[in-house]
Amino acid sequence: MRMNKQIVVTDWIKEKPKLGLFLKLTLSSDERRILRGKRLTDCDQEIILQLPRNGKLNDGDILSTNESNFYVEIIAKTEDLIEISSNSKIELIKTAYHLGNRHVEVEIEEGILLTKSDYVIKNMLLNFKVNVKNTKKKFFPERGAHSHE
């Protein structure tokens, strides 16, 4: 459903309303950091984000709009990633160190590291004592120590 009226997204809602129309907005990990500006929902409805600057959009977030019965649901986009694993915890820690030294975003899961697909990084990883494979998943990188999110 497309509306001709401009929809402005203004804030987060703690609980999903039982009634109302929901627009889905699928965003990459990078796009989920940007809290202001025009976006197209999954059904090509243009919306304007005007959210408070002190946050980050997360998978499943529900956002309120200037239209009382319209809401926006954030969906994390599936992204091309590199999955890194090893039988050796120390090798995985060394790899995390090298990725951090290059300011590469990393998601840390039990026994694996995930980072965005990048041929330079992948070639570097092939020189380490770790297993490297391509995968497609939703990406939730660790927030850095100097993050303002």
Swiss-Prot record:
Report the subcellular localization.
Answer: Cytoplasm
- What is the annotated signal peptide range for this record? none
Q: Which GO terms describe its biological process?
A: protein folding; protein-containing complex assembly; urea metabolic process
- List the InterPro entries hit by this protein, alphabetically: UreE, UreE_C_dom, UreE_N, UreE_N_sf
- Any one GO CC term of the record: cytoplasm
Task: Output the superkingdom of the source species.
Answer: Bacteria
Give the matching SMART domains: UreE_N (SM00988)
A single GO molecular function, which one? unfolded protein binding
Q: Which UniProt keywords apply?
A: Chaperone, Cytoplasm, Nickel, Nickel insertion
Family recorded in the similarity comment: Belongs to the UreE family.
Job description of the protein: Involved in urease metallocenter assembly. Binds nickel. Probably functions as a nickel donor during metallocenter assembly.
Q: This protein is called what?
A: Urease accessory protein UreE
Q: What is the lineage of its organism?
A: Bacteria, Bacillati, Cyanobacteriota, Cyanophyceae, Synechococcales
